[in-house]
Amino acid sequence: MSNASKFFTSLAVQLTYNVPSLRQYICEAVTKRSDIASLSLSEQWRRLVLGPISNLQSESCQSYVLVVDALDECEDDKDVRIILQLLAEARSLTTVRLRVFLTSRPEISIRYSMHHILQAEHQDFILHNVPATVINHDISLFLEYNLGIIRQEWTLGADWPGEVVLRQLVLYACGLFIWAATACRFIREGRRFACKRLDTILKGSSSAITAPEKHLNEIYLAVLEHSIFSGYSEEEKEEAYNMLKHTLGSIVVLLSPLSTSSLSRLLHLSKKEVDQTFEDLYAILDIPEDSTYPVRLHHPSFRDFLLNKDRCGDFWVDNKEAHQILADGCIQLMSETLKKDICEMQAPGSLATQVDSSYVEKCLPSEVQYACLYWVQHLQRSGAPLSDNDRVHQFLQAHILHWLEALSWIRKISDGIIAIHSLEALISVSLLTIYYETLTNLY
């Protein structure tokens, strides 16, 4: 997840499934504070994780490991520091042995935060310092296992793909597991054309001496190019390219993942168009069978690839333009959806905490909640100039109160206040008067 708002609540849910004896204590914590999801990260950690685990009996002598993968994908450096500080408190437990296994790219905020944790409380393991022979051996095992599954599925013969090909693939991977994983998914998605796709990789890959990044570029390009049907006319190919860049560009700059259903509504496309665009992209996208579950990238390196013009050529996505598309989509969706008393309570003063969350989600679907939370951030990142009587001006004039009301229903009114302060740096004096007058009239 790109933000930490659901980090500890997600962890608590997983604990209830994997450690049944914790379920009672976690449920009690939620019962005591029904608004627990809106509390600070430290409160969530202590009420949902640390507190319940401390209630376990010491006689069980159990050891537990919390696995936190890719912490660097959390965009807020402050949240990263808080999470690391809180996780370090795991050592304070006396009734059970709790350890944290954490992976991350070596971003500055991560390294800085780790340096402020006592050396005795953590061990660092730098992947780049692992001998190449060890990594290549592991990649070879990974490839052998996954290609073996493909061999069995399509009865490709006991000697497929063979030791020589396996060694070639290990060389092409250049120590990158993401290359090996993407290659295996690409081959497997080819189904009866699995052998042909393997040949595409072998013929397309440049010399093993080339930098690892180039090999990753080649495998990503192969996946994208195969998603465009070669039998299309030039005009149809152009349309397919544009749709691919439009939808993938949105996926890689989303500030929180969305389902294909929500994404289609946010981009004002039919769900069929989005599904058809993504149907050959399972090698790079994690697309759940349930269309209400969010779509995610298999690896953040694809985001880096797609936003770099030098690496992906015709598939390049302009970062600012992608944010502009999402900002426009958010504003249009909110303008079409938001209204006074959107939850139809017909009772001024109703508290969000007293209304069932499923009812709120029915009135404010995921894509509308996303638009309310992130439209200002997308606007900021687009770098687009604003002026009087433009779409932002018109939206604020018509819907600022409806927007704030929606945020209050999803218990994110503080995000609205932060967004309003952010708008001050973007909009003109005449625009500022709109919401200052509106907010003044509230009191």
What is the role of each PLM region?
Residues 1-325, 344-346, 352-361, 390-393, ...:
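Conserved NB-ARC/NACHT P-loop NTPase core of NLR-like innate immune receptors
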Residues 329-396, 402:
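Extended alpha-helical scaffolding segments used for macromolecular assembly and cargo binding
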